From Swiss-Prot:
Homotetramer. Coiled coil: none annotated. It comes from the Archaea. Pathway: Amino-acid biosynthesis; S-adenosyl-L-methionine biosynthesis. The gene is dadD. CDD domains: ATZ_TRZ_like. Zn(2+) binds at H63, H65, H211, D299. It comes from Methanococcoides burtonii (strain DSM 6242 / NBRC 107633 / OCM 468 / ACE-M). This is 5'-deoxyadenosine deaminase. Its cofactor is Zn(2+). Catalyzes the deamination of three SAM-derived enzymatic products, namely 5'-deoxyadenosine, S-adenosyl-L-homocysteine, and 5'-methylthioadenosine, to produce the inosine analogs. Can also deaminate adenosine. The preferred substrate for this enzyme is 5'-deoxyadenosine, but all these substrates are efficiently deaminated. Likely functions in a S-adenosyl-L-methionine (SAM) recycling pathway from S-adenosyl-L-homocysteine (SAH) produced from SAM-dependent methylation reactions. Its EC number is 3.5.4.41, 3.5.4.31, 3.5.4.4, 3.5.4.28. Keywords: Hydrolase, Metal-binding, Zinc.
Length: 434
């Protein structure tokens, strides 16, 4: 007997080898998908009627800072330097482990409710992030954010912390948690330190998560410091490869794009954050045309201000259309692939499509709503009309985390209350020092 059968829904497989099934079934057993078909003879302990819904792979958020939910709306509409120096950095200096735990629990709740099944996170107090992921049932690729600032002693300590986190948490939560090394960025970490990180990642057989060319200021700093941009500098130390997840990648030359594509680097595009901070527009269409694996991330709530991948998909599609002045750029199905297939590839998880033997990481979206009617084209409707609030059910590793909008793995109101209190206390501590 199977664990779960999902029936009567429009099955959007995201599988290039299998057509969508307008009225199909998905059968789940032992945390895996065992059948995707029009009908089934299987029986199950749980039967979910997806009538009026779309059954599809859950989303993969490939770049965020989950604990920063506590900073949602804290300092908006400010120049980047002022935003960081006068608000975010002083607040982060007061963060405690319990703050990050409360903020991450809130982030996990928000992601479950909006259909995200896995996320890549870089922040501090990462053990607390691991605890939150372990509790809630999501998948995550976690990295301790290492900032060395050309200080050898600091770099040694940062790499030690990163290694300890890798050893303690990689593979935890029944394999739902993987750990990556997280050197923050080329403009906060020296070339020598980044080279050491690459060597350590190879030795430990783990991936790397890094910010690359998020701002024009980084581009200018790298040219002044090294006589070349971040991508070229990283290429000189053989930093790149399929085990690298590079966030942002905005200020790229054509040569930079070739380097990233040729080295199979995974690129996390964060359009909402990039627009909000006026960082620039990533050349997504050029990167995709060169064969790069471009996926989607939300960045942290301080610069987004939510973790809704529907929001990210629509923004990504619209931004590329206006940037290229081509309404056919980044069509709905392609941006859906970025949010599912490409993201799963970047995090090396066997998810992102509805296919036999793949992880049972499945969401159901309620399409029987005014803003989703009439329904002519499912991918188009999901990208341009749907929101995270339309997700009805979220399943990860064959476990139902949310059913009919009710979260089963967390006390929703308690999580919200705890995060509100943590944010209030944090701001009070910051204000007391000013």
């Amino acid at each position: 007997m199977a664990d779960i059968i999902i029936k009567n829904g429009y099955v959007l497989t995201m599988d290039p080898e299998v057509d969508d099934i307008p009225n199909g079934v998905v059968v789940i057993e032992g945390g895996k998908i065992v059948e995707v078909a029009e009908t089934t003879s299987a029986t199950a302990n749980t039967v979910i009627d997806a009538q009026g819904g779309v059954v599809m792979p859950g989303f993969v958020n490939t770049h965020t800072h989950a604990g920063m939910t506590l900073f949602r709306g804290y300092a908006d509409d400010l120049p980047l330097a002022q935003w960081l120096q006068e608000h975010i950095w002083p607040a982060e200096a007061e963060l405690t482990a319990s703050d990050v735990l409360a903020g991450t629990r809130l982030a996990c709740l928000e992601m479950i409710k909006s259909g995200t099944i896995a996320f890549a996170d870089m922040y501090f107090f990462m053990e607390e992030v691991g605890k939150a992921v372990e509790e809630c049932g999501l998948r995550a690729a976690l990295s301790y954010g290492m900032i060395e600032l050309w200080d050898d002693e600091k770099g040694t300590n940062e790499l030690k912390k990163g290694r300890e986190f890798v050893k303690e948490w990689n593979g935890k939560a029944e394999g739902r948690i993987s750990v990556m090394y997280g050197p923050h960025a080329p403009n906060t970490c020296s070339k020598e330190f980044l080279s050491k990180v690459k060597e350590q990642a190879i030795a430990d057989n783990v991936k790397i998560h890094i910010h690359v060319l998020e701002t024009e200021a980084e581009l200018n700093q790298m040219k002044e410091q090294y006589g070349m941009c971040s991508v070229n500098m990283l290429d000189t130390i053989d930093f790149f490869g399929p085990g690298v997840l590079a966030a942002h990648c905005i200020w790229l030359s054509d040569g930079d794009m070739d380097i990233l594509a040729d080295n199979n680097v995974n690129i996390a595009h964060n359009p909402v954050s990039n627009m909000k901070l006026a960082s620039g527009v990533a050349p997504v269409m050029k990167l995709l045309d060169k064969g790069a694996n471009v996926c989607l991330g939300t960045d942290g709530c301080a610069s987004n201000n939510n973790l809704d991948m529907f929001d990210e998909m629509k923004t990504a599609a619209l931004l590329q259309k206006v940037d290229t002045m081509d309404p056919t750029a980044l069509p709905a199905k392609q941006v859906l692939e970025m949010a599912t297939v490409n993201g799963a590839k970047a995090l090396d998880i066997n998810s992102g499509v509805l296919r036999k033997d793949y992880n049972a990481d499945v969401i159901i979206i309620d399409m029987n709503k005014a803003h989703l009617s009439p329904l002519f084209d499912v991918p188009s409707q999901l990208v341009y009309s749907a929101t995270g609030n339309d997700v009805r059910t979220t399943i990860v590793n064959g476990v139902v985390l949310m059913d009919e909008r009710k979260v089963l793995c967390m006390n929703e109101q308690q999580v919200i209350n705890d995060a509100k209190q943590a944010a209030s206390d944090l701001v009070s501590r910051v204000d007391a020092k000013n």
